Amino acid sequence: MTKLTNGHLVTQDSVGVTRHDYLYRISLKALIYNDAGQILVVKEINRTYWDLPGGGMDYDEDFESSLKRELYEEVGYKGDLRYQLFDASGEMYIERLDANQICFYCRVWPENFDFIPGEEGDEVMFVDPEELLLQKSEVDAPARAYRVHMKWQELYGE
């Protein structure tokens, strides 16, 4: 018997031995700066907080195609990009998905800055990194976005 619970598969074999196998959803977030050093953030539809654009990878996507799709869906971005994977989160359980998630953070250099709310985005703007710490939110997405910014600064001082 196999069932999915709390983000992992619980399997019991014929002699009663139970095994837990974790399923991981891979999520990508894009750290994009403008020339003033501000960070691109999006407030998705039906959400009350600002976050870095990005989301879960779909089956058979690579990092670049997933980043392009997510940027199009959330911030209306159409164009080429360069990216550098530079950090990963610890495991997070996402109750609405019943899945454990690991988020990979990518510094993204878009070929243009034509950002408008996409089909999943409600508002899009650039903010000073410190403003993320002032966001009141039921989730830690704004603070996590700030930590990602600080990690990039620590590694590359850009």
Residue ranges and their predicted role:
Residues 90-113, 125:
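Active-site-adjacent beta-strand/loop module that shapes the phosphate/pyrophosphate-binding cleft
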Residues 48-49, 119-158:
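Nudix hydrolase/Nudix homology domain
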Residues 38-39, 111-115:
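Short helix-loop capping/hinge motifs at secondary-structure junctions, enriched
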Residues 34-74:
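Conserved Nudix-box catalytic region and its N-terminal flanking loop in Nudix hydrolases
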Residues 32-33, 41, 106, 126:
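Conserved hydrophobic "DFG−1" position in protein kinase catalytic cores
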Residues 1-29:
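Acidic, metal-coordinating catalytic segment for phosphate/diphosphate chemistry
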Residues 78-87:
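A short coil-to-beta-strand element that immediately follows conserved catalytic motifs
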